[in-house]
Amino acid sequence: MTESTGPDLIAADAAIDGIEWNILGQIYRPKQLSERSFSWHATFPPDTFVPPHVHPTQDEYVYVLDGELTLFDGESDHAARPGDLLRMPMGSPHGLFNRSGAPVVCLFWVTPTGRLYDLFVGIDGMAEQTPDAVVALAAEHEVEFLPPPES
């Protein structure tokens, strides 16, 4: 990892090495990476989601820039709109859903970085992002996917 030694500006259209990942149908563009934190710009097309999961070693944050993103906290849904910040402390179950019918744009970050960057590289590189393959790879990278909620 290359860390900046001072203040820095990362342009709106910039991504680390021009990277653009497809993660479960969303588009992620990594913005900043260090041992202490990792941030990425995300676009959630309508009807895409990140299933309920836990980061046992990371705090995760999402700042909504455009659209409406639903946080499922393991018990109930919370609608986040532009300007809202979602905070998911390490060890807390959460899933993120775009049920709005329009794209959602947001900025994510985690602290510390852990192995999340490497997980995204692995998922993006899959020939087919099947649930079983993603869950297995995630387990190797400090992310635990949870069973679907009971109906």
Where are these regions (language model features)?
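A short, N-terminal "cap"/entry segment at the start of jelly-roll beta-barrel domains
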Residues: 1-38, 124-151
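A hydrophobic/aromatic-rich effector-binding and dimerization subdomain
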Residues: 6, 108-129
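Short acidic-glycine-tyrosine-enriched beta hairpin
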Residues: 11, 75-93
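Conserved short histidine dyad/triad with adjacent acidic residue
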Residues: 24-25, 40-55
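Conserved hydrophobic/aromatic beta-strand scaffold that supports enzyme active sites
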Residues: 30, 39-43, 61, 77, ...
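Short beta-strand segments in beta-sandwich/barrel cores
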Residues: 48-50, 67-72, 86
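Glycine- and acidic-residue-biased ligand/ion/polar-headgroup-sensing regions
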Residues: 57-69, 74
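Ligand-binding loop in jelly-roll beta-barrel domains
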Residues: 70, 90-117
